Amino acid sequence: MGKNVVVLGTQWGDEGKGKIVDLLTEQAKYVVRYQGGHNAGHTLVIDGDKTVLHLIPSGILRDNVKCIIGNGVVLAPDALMTEINMLKERGVPVEERLLISEACPLILPFHCALDMAREKARGNKAIGTTGRGIGPAYEDKVSRRGLRVGDLFNAELFAEKLKEVMAYHNFMLTEYYKCEAVDYEETLKDALAIADYLKSMCTDVSELLDQARKAGEPILFEGAQGTLLDIDHGTYPFVTSSNTTAGGVATGSGFGPRHLDYVLGIMKAYTTRVGAGPFPTELENEIGDYLGTKGHEFGATTGRKRRPGWLDIVAMKRAVQINSVSGFCLTKLDVLDGLEEVKICVGYQYPDGTVATTTPLAAEGYEQVTPVLETMPGWSETTFGATSVEQLPQAAMNYIKRLEELLETPIDIISTGPDRNETMILVNPFS
């Protein structure tokens, strides 16, 4: 029987999920996105050729894989078409490989306008959203006024629903935010123009996945962003608008949670965060600059500079707990090469001197703490491109072993470079 594997980020995103998903899809029949939207950026490097995907699952480059966008994903038709056209120019037969849930909420131009207007109005209290309409689209879903992909297939009813929701949002844009209204006729025309094309790729995702499971076909679920950005369990309100944790698989795809076999947590050997929000181990010094430069820490979606810091075990333990992590994939180990010492956060100290080994439940709590750091010897030798544990310096092996001890969870995969070949699979999640 095939296994059903979840791959998700355990930090604030940008952990290197795209490469690992691409590597593991060699063994999968289906790759499923279950949350987020085109705010995610997954970078794949294959034989030196870089491809950045935002919406379509990372398995799209493999001819043995069907890629699925589940109902938990908010879908921007224009962004989807841009990505499809980019892939088709590279010779990828997207229509043969991509399937979409009719229940995906649509991101339309007024969602993006609202997103940008709100961020501007927040001033120095801005959350740091990508401005791509993700949050407003999820809001419409929860308030039950949102339009879904399936609504496009009845033009008359879609036009009626669109008029109603745009009247509501344009009122907010013009009267509250003092911005221009979004044009209804243009929005309607653009949306309906690709209705038939989208319909050709739509399917009942829950039924398809259940039939695949019963047939013993391996399924890989691809998470976007990271655990600490989860709407419920992250550093609220500096979070995304979806459930980035393993629980989101069931709600975002219609796949039964009892049928998940393995949860692979992707963990960078240090930590980064992009945008605003608390970050206890942030390094605003020359070491932070070193990690940011060597790690090429710029967002794949926005191009924004990421904020680097030491690995935070307190936050990682919460990720293990929430996601039932079976094993970790450690990425960007090579970025630590050349440091005389490396540090790990093992506790949070509060102003009254108490030390906690569990995370707070909101941003305000994180802002009170200072990290309790454990120092380990660094290594001068390179780990870049290593393909076996025996090739690693002893100090790097000691670092990995210490992480496993602290997290009480094995590191089953080690990544030592951006290419899919620069990876050590110690335990195969699909085996």
From Swiss-Prot:
It catalyses: IMP + L-aspartate + GTP = N(6)-(1,2-dicarboxyethyl)-AMP + GDP + phosphate + 2 H(+). Mg(2+) binds at residues 14, 41. It is found in: Cytoplasm. IMP binds at residues 14-17, 39-42, 130, 144, 225, 240, 304. Disulfide bonds: none annotated. Substrate binds at residues 300-306. One of its GO terms (molecular function) is GTP binding. Gene3D superfamilies: Adenylosuccinate Synthetase, subunit A, domain 1 (3.40.440.10), Adenylosuccinate Synthetase, subunit A, domain 2 (1.10.300.10), Adenylosuccinate Synthetase, subunit A, domain 3 (3.90.170.10). The active site is at 14 (proton acceptor), 42 (proton donor). Binds 1 Mg(2+) ion per subunit. Keywords: Cytoplasm, GTP-binding, Ligase, Magnesium, Metal-binding, Nucleotide-binding, Purine biosynthesis. It is an enzyme of class 6 (ligase). GTP binds at residues 13-19, 41-43, 306, 332-334, 415-417. Its main location: cytoplasm. Its EC number is 6.3.4.4. The keyword rRNA-binding does not apply. GO terms for biological process: 'de novo' AMP biosynthetic process; IMP metabolic process. Plays an important role in the de novo pathway of purine nucleotide biosynthesis. Catalyzes the first committed step in the biosynthesis of AMP from IMP. NCBIfam families: PRK01117.1, purA. Belongs to the adenylosuccinate synthetase family. This is Adenylosuccinate synthetase. The gene is purA.
